[in-house]
Structure formats: structure tokens, C-alpha cells
């Protein structure tokens, strides 16, 4: 049985319309949005009737799964070889379109916060960092093209709207083979929606929720000519919301458009454009001060906002991308991907530091308000080309992928800062944000850098025996960074190796190894870049799948050894900027275990349940990044009632253990500030009114648990209990 036949059996048909007069509507939308407009399926086999093996790449792994599934039959995560999760010797999680819809995960950050083994550190209202296995995640890829995020500046990567993505793949552990510099925490691959429909179809949604949160999204797709060889898709949306935080208001607009052209029977060209704009008034910057000058803790309301009335945070991102795919009759496939991104931000911010008097609310002589006006521009250009397919050796079939890539990132950051005295701030106990905007001094250059990566990579999956396979590969990377604060060139070879042994038709054991090489964009207080992170990553475990891959499970143990890992220094900044200062740690070791089960347990019940426990310490025995939880549990379920098939209900719980940070108290002593363990409970229900129309309700933080989202510094509160109601019309 071929992979296409399996996909056909598994597919759930989407309601559609074939009226050709609808072509013009989509054509106009595509032409308006995209100004640059200019199949062979490999054979597969089955382990048995209940377990799927993918032995070669299909032309599009992102579209080959049922619309309402929580799993996918195959993914290129980690190696670019199109494999089942059982055949990948690393921990892999998948968030499908249906899971994102059920849980109402409106941006990438919301999605990542609900992934097994990933934890969030919400620095303030606009900036959130993600960690896995004790390490900061900075590898984000778009359709397999790497893009590095820095912790210093926020260009909105994690606030990118989820409506434009078909799914999100996550590989925990080092992925240097495919992403270049290897981050040992995790790599996030966002797979964009494609123009793959040959009939006109659409999805319209509107939602309203707490704090006047209004959201409208349209997703239209269909053919642009009679034969369907030219297709288009547009996803656009608008969101406007207040917040539980006083004086905070946010507006978001996005437009995503893509066209696909079948140049021949075996060659397809995809072109696309992604525009995202976010404008925020009253954003917070860091956390609220912890103590009064007498050493007593300050008790805040969740609504307290330390920002001034004149503050804002505006982000604009534009991406253009292209993909050319050719499938050959011998099962080989060649892909060339390219993207160009221009992102900029403009932010006026205010941060309070020091200790106010408990009675008068006036900050002590060491306290002040730090006002900053920041502008940044980042351009990224990346090209990736690779070939993949089967080959025969020693009488057995194997798979190979080989490719080259190039990326260039240019960054330019400007700043202007001013100090507000305690007298200008006034009584902190009655702070309302009503303070005069400073007379900003002339712009100064914070940094201007160009980072380049050139690489070649290759990996092969060797079928050693019927149950045993070996994945081996390597990547050669040339890395350079030149600019105002960096002038370095590094070359590195990153090896990768993994074994997978099929125990029986449902279970496999695996083990893998890869080295770590991560040049750091972190800087110390003097503005010097930290040395590259180096190390090793080991992982071993067991995986299973059932019902043709509809449900998957994994249990893995890992050990990560690192040198020169950058750790944040509380209340320390680079050259008086808003950039957090870091220091290098020696001999960091993270070891632990994670578990996940995901998919359709029955015809009516889908769930994702994952748990992670790790311990990360440096050579002195000190805990690494102690503000991140070392134990976490995440559960989400969706259940369609058998007696009332139009009603689906579900929910979940996220739990994490106690964390702490070290801060300087008014006595000048280092004090540990703890955040206790907490659970968050979420619920949802959806009723299918007609075949096309559905209504859904979501409740977040059902029991209104309160905690500090900024464990690395200050106080910032999580969102209280809140709701949303959405109406969705599909055709």
C-alpha cells in the first residue's frame, strides 16, 4: 500500500464548494497581498495493520493528516528525513491545527507554553522567553529554514499569530544537524499553511472574551485557474484587546498570502508573504519592585501597571518566502527554500528600580525611574537547498538527505535614555502612570552587527537489519559575527548519531548522540559577547504508536553536558541599556526524563499528556536557571459525546514545581525569592450547530490561581480567570 493510499483512507473530507465564480474573489485577494507573484509519492510499507512506517519523503508532509487529528503520520523534525515519530531517535512533540483550535492558542507563545517539557518566563507584558531541559530556546525555524532569536530584543517571534500555521513541530534536545548552531534546549519548527485546495473553501471566525478581547480571522483558499494548477490562500485577521493590567491596550493585524503553481506534474513553486503588526499602549518593562525600604514585601494588585501613560511597544514584521519542490520517478526529491525577513520595533518604556518608603511611597536615594526609547531593525536572508530519497546498498533500502544552507542576519539597535528622580515619580503607593515624558537626548548606537552562517550537511538512515536502523550525519558550519561589539569567526563540525530498534509492531527503543556548538548573543555587563557554548547531548528511551500512528507515546532519558552556558544576572544590564546581562557558567550538566502520550485514545477521546523532570547544575553544584521549573505536568483532552456527537468538551491542567530567584534586598543582602508550585486548569466546549457553523467557549485559569510570571526579576502577575466565546463558519 502506498503512502498516498494510506493518506486517502485516513483523510477526513472538508466541506467545500466547487463554484468557479468564487475564483475571482480569491484571485483579487492574492494579487492585492502578493506583489511578487510571478507527484511523485514514494512507496511506504506497514509494520503491521496498526503501525505506519514512512520510508521516503512525500511531496508535502504537512498536509497528509486528517483535519481533526492531534498527531501526524510523519515529520521531518530533526533530520529532514520524513519519518514517523517512532523512527526519530529524539523526543518530538507536535501541535496540530486541531489542538491549537481546541485550546484557543492564538499565538506561538500560547502554543509553546502548552508543550511538554517547555516552560515560559514572562519578563513583562511583551517579552517572553522559553526554556527546555534547563536551557533557553533560541532556535526557531519556518518551514525548516533556521532563524535565530536573541533574548536582548523583542521582534515578536513568539507573538506571531498561530492562524497562519498548519502545525508546530518541537524537537527537545540539540538539533545542530539541521538548525546550524545547536541549541540543546529545543528547536521549534513552524509549518505554514499551504495553498493546497483545488476547490474554493474558507473558514471565518469571530470571538469575544474578557477585557473586551475581540478577534476576527478569515482563511480563504482555492484554485486560481480552471485546472487547479494555480492555487491561492489568504489568512488575515485583526485583534483588539484591553487587559487585566490598568492602562494596557493592544492591537494586532496580520495578513498571510501564498500561491502555489504546479510548473510540471512533478514540480511545484510556492510563493508567500507574511505581514504582522502589533501596537501596544501601556506596556510593562520588567517587574514591579519587590520590597519597601524597611524590608517588608510590597503587596500589589494584579491590575497594577508600573508604566507611564506615554509608553508604547510597536512591532512590525514582513516576510517573503519561496519554495521550489521537484519529485523524481525514482523516489528522490529536491527542495530549495528561501526567505527574507525585515522586522523593526519602536518602544518607549519605563522601569522602576529601588525601594520606596512604606508610608510616603517615595523611593530612597538609590531609587529612580529608568526611561528608555529603543528602536531596532533586523533583516534576515536565508536559503536552504537539499535533496533526499532512497538508495540501495548491500541489498537493503536506505534513505539519504544532503544539503547546503546560507543565512545572514543584520541587526541595528538605537537607544535614548533618561532618569526620573524619586521626586518626579512621587508616591509609589498611589502610582497612576501620570508622569511627564522626558526630553529625550540624542540617539545613540547600542549595537550594529552582521551574523552569517554557511553550512553543508548530510544524514542517512541505514536499515542494518529488519528491526534495527542507524541514523548518522554531520554538519559543517562556518559562523561569523562582525560589528560594534563582536568580531569573531568560528568553524565547527557537528556530528549526529542515533539507533532505533523495533522491539515489536508497536514499540521501539532508541538512543542518540550529538555535539553542541552555540555561539552566544548574550553579553556581560561590559558588552562583551560570551564564548560559544560547547558540549554533548545524550538521549535514550522507548517509543510506541498504535492505530496507524493515531496515537503515539515516548519515554526518554537525557544527559546534556555544557561549557560556557550563559546565565542571566538579576538586576544587571549591558551598558545601561534594557538588555539583561549574562555570565558564563562552567561544567553545566542537565539530566532528566520526559514522557508524552498524544493522539486519539478512542474514536471520541483525544488527549495530550506529558511530564518532565530534570536537574541542571553547574560545576559548583549550583542550580542552573533556578527560576525555571524542574518538574512539570501538562494534560489536555478533547471528548466528543457518543450520545450527542455535535458536542465536544474538554480541558486540561498545567502544573509546575517551586522555583526561586536571587535578588538584592534593602539591606544589601542576597535573598532567595520563591514562587510556589501551582496548577492552571483550562476548559473548552464546542457545539456543531450545522455542518458549517460551530460555537466554542474557552475558560482559562478556571480557579483563578495567582503567581509571578517574572521569576528572573521583579513581580509580574499572570492573567486571572478569563473566558472567550467564538463563532466559526467553514465552507
Place the predicted regions along the sequence by residue.
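Gram-negative outer-membrane beta-barrel transporters
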Residues: 467, 583-664, 703-706, 726
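Outer-membrane beta-barrel translocator/receptor signature
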Residues: 148-149, 164-166, 177-255, 263-267, ...
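Structural signature of Gram-negative outer-membrane beta-barrels, strongest in the C-terminal barrel
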Residues: 262-264, 378, 397-409, 447-562, ...
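Acidic/polar loop-and-plug regions of large Gram-negative outer-membrane beta-barrel proteins
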Residues: 239-243, 256-327, 342-378, 422-445, ...
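Short acidic/polar hinge/loop motifs at secondary-structure boundaries
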Residues: 120, 129, 145-172, 191-192, ...
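Membrane-embedded beta-barrel scaffold of Gram-negative outer-membrane proteins
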Residues: 325-329, 333-339, 343-349, 509, ...
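C-terminal beta-signal and adjacent terminal beta-strands/loops
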Residues: 656-664, 683-731
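Extracytoplasmic beta-strand/coil segments of soluble accessory domains associated
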Residues: 70-93, 109-146, 166
Amino acid at each position: 500500500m502506498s503512502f498516498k493510499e494510506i493518506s486517502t483512507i485516513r483523510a477526513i473530507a472538508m466541506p467545500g464548494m466547487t463554484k468557479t465564480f468564487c475564483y475571482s474573489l480569491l484571485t483579487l485577494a492574492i494579487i492585492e497581498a502578493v506583489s511578487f507573484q510571478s507527484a511523485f509519492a514514494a512507496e511506504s510499507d506497514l509494520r503491521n495493520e496498526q503501525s505506519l512506517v514512512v520510508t521516503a519523503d512525500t511531496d508535502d508532509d504537512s498536509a497528509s493528516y486528517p483535519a481533526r487529528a492531534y498527531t501526524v503520520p510523519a515529520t521531518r523534525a530533526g533530520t529532514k528525513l520524513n519519518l514517523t515519530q517512532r523512527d526519530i531517535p529524539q523526543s518530538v512533540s507536535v501541535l496540530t491545527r486541531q489542538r491549537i483550535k481546541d485550546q484557543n492558542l492564538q499565538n506561538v507563545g500560547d502554543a509553546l507554553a502548552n508543550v511538554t517539557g517547555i516552560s515560559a518566563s514572562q519578563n513583562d507584558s511583551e517579552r517572553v522567553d522559553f526554556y527546555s531541559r534547563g536551557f533557553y530556546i533560541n532556535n526557531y525555524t519556518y518551514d525548516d529554514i533556521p532563524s535565530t532569536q536573541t533574548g536582548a530584543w523583542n521582534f515578536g517571534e513568539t507573538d506571531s499569530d498561530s492562524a497562519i500555521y498548519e502545525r508546530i513541530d518541537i524537537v527537545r534536545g540539540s538539533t545542530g544537524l539541521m538548525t546550524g548552531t545547536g541549541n540543546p534546549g529545543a528547536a521549534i519548527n513552524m509549518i505554514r499553511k499551504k495553498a493546497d485546495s483545488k476547490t474554493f473553501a474558507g473558514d471565518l471566525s469571530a470571538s469575544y472574551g474578557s477585557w473586551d478581547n475581540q478577534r476576527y480571522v478569515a482563511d480563504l483558499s482555492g484554485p486560481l485557474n480552471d485546472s487547479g494548477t494555480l492555487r491561492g490562500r489568504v489568512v488575515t485577521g485583526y485583534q483588539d484587546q484591553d487587559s487585566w493590567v490598568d492602562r494596557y491596550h493592544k492591537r494586532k493585524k496580520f495578513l498571510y498570502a501564498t500561491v502555489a503553481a504546479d510548473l510540471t506534474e512533478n514540480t511545484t513553486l510556492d510563493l508567500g508573504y507574511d505581514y504582522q503588526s502589533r501596537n501596544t499602549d501601556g506596556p510593562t518593562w520588567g517587574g514591579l519592585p519587590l520590597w519597601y525600604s524597611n524590608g517588608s514585601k510590597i503587596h500589589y494588585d494584579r491590575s497594577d501597571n508600573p508604566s507611564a501613560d506615554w509608553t508604547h511597544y510597536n512591532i512590525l514584521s514582513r516576510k517573503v518566502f519561496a519554495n521550489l519542490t521537484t519529485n523524481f520517478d525514482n523516489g528522490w526529491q529536491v527542495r530549495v527554500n528561501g526567505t527574507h525577513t525585515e522586522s523593526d520595533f519602536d518602544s518607549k518604556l519605563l522601569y522602576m528600580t529601588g525601594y520606596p518608603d512604606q508610608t510616603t511611597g517615595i523611593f530612597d536615594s538609590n531609587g529612580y525611574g529608568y526611561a528608555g526609547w529603543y528602536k531596532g531593525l533586523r533583516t534576515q536572508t536565508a536559503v536552504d537547498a537539499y535533496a533526499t530519497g532512497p538508495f540501495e546498498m548491500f541489498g537493503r533500502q536506505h534513505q539519504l538527505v544532503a544539503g547546503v544552507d546560507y543565512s545572514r542576519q543584520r541587526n541595528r539597535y538605537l537607544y535614548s535614555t533618561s532618569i526620573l528622580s524619586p521626586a518626579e515619580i512621587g508616591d509609589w503607593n498611589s502610582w497612576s502612570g501620570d508622569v511627564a515624558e522626558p526630553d529625550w537626548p540624542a540617539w545613540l548606537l547600542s549595537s550594529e552587527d552582521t551574523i552569517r552562517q554557511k553550512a553543508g550537511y548530510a544524514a542517512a538512515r541505514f536499515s542494518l537489519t529488519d528491526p534495527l536502523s542507524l541514523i548518522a550525519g554531520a554538519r559543517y558550519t562556518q559562523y561569523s559575527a562582525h560589528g560594534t561589539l563582536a568580531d569573531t569567526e568560528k568553524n565547527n563540525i557537528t556530528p549526529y548519531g542515533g539507533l532505533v530498534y523495533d522491539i515489536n509492531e508497536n514499540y521501539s527503543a532508541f538512543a542518540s548522540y550529538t555535539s553542541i556548538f552555540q555561539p552566544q548573543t548574550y553579553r556581560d555587563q561590559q558588552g562583551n559577547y560570551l564564548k560559544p557554548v560547547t558540549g554533548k547531548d545524550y538521549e535514550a528511551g522507548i517509543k510506541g504508536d498504535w492505530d496507524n500512528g493515531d496515537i503515539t507515546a515516548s519515554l526518554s532519558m537525557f544527559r546534556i553536558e555544557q561549557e560556557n552556558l550563559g546565565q542571566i544576572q538579576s538586576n544587571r544590564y549591558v551598558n545601561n541599556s534594557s538588555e539583561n546581562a549574562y555570565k558564563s557558567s562552567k561544567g553545566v550538566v542537565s539530566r532528566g526524563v520526559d514522557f508524552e502520550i498524544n493522539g486519539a485514545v478512542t474514536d471520541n477521546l483525544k488527549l495530550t499528556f506529558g511530564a518532565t523532570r530534570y536537574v541542571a547544575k553547574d560545576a559548583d553544584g549550583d542550580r542552573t536557571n533556578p527560576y525555571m521549573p524542574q518538574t512539570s505536568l501538562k494534560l489536555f483532552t478533547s471528548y466528543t459525546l457518543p450520545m450527542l456527537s455535535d458536542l465536544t468538551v474538554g480541558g486540561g491542567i498545567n502544573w509546575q514545581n517551586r522555583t526561586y530567584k536571587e535578588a538584592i534586598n534593602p539591606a544589601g543582602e542576597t535573598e532567595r525569592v520563591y514562587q510556589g508550585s501551582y496548577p492552571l486548569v483550562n476548559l473548552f466546549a464546542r457545539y456543531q450547530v450545522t455542518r458549517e457553523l460551530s460555537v466554542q467557549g474557552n475558560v482559562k485559569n478556571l480557579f483563578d490561581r495567582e503567581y509571578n510570571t517574572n521569576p528572573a526579576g521583579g513581580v509580574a502577575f499572570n492573567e486571572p480567570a478569563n473566558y472567550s466565546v467564538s463563532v466559526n463558519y467553514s465552507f
